[in-house]
Amino acid sequence: MFKHVSKLTSEQIISLEAPLMYKGIQNITFTEIDIEKQGIIEETMLKMLKSRYAFYDKDNKKHPSILLIKDDRIKTNQIDLMNELYNNKKIQKNWALIVYNGDGIFVKLPQHKNIEIQKNESINSTLQKIKDLYQESIKYIAIISGDLANRGLSFVSTDYSWHLTHMIMCASNSSTGTNLMQYSRLCGCYNDDIPLEMFTSVDITHELFAYDNLQERCVEKCEDPLLD
């Protein structure tokens, strides 16, 4: 039920402050890629290997690069992408690959590593199991997802110590700012200083920052005493 307010004043608006540990769009490094280019995901993952990231959590324990690939909505294509990536020997050797969609969880670990994952396992418990078994040896994790990688889902381990560090956003350039912001699962509350990086197109980057600025202006306007 909605209550109609004939005259809204600034005193009736409660502004909620973001937690100090919150990382938003302004805290993310954006790297331009051609999201239409064939093989751009594989190319980006190989470049990440060359960067030799070394991350540590708040307890100074190793934290892997965890990449979310927000790509095709068609579930069979997500499995095809995982298999295609796994056929690359460098990726097969270094990356743990996860598909997370409405059909469940599908996992391929680097060579000579095994894990027992139930099909209906949550992404959080899956990350936790990998952490418990292979924290010292698995340095790269890629999660391929579609519609499930939207607002309301946090890609973190159950103990909250592992979280996303990178994202490839291959959304349509015609996507609205609202949708793109909901796709941006890198945003969140993290109790460490691990840098966050988004790989996407120039158009999507501009749209995200434009929408973020619009939100800021709306908040400032609502807090303006002249509203009265």
Question: Residue locations for each model-derived region?
Answer:
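Catalytic cores of nucleophile-dependent amide-cleaving enzymes
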Residues: 148, 182-186, 202-203
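Conserved SF2 helicase motif VI
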Residues: 157, 165-194
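Long, hydrophobic alpha-helical segments
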Residues: 206-228
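Conserved C-terminal RecA-like helicase domain
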Residues: 19-150, 160, 173-180
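Long, low-complexity intrinsically disordered regions enriched in Ser/Thr/Pro/Gly
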Residues: 195-204
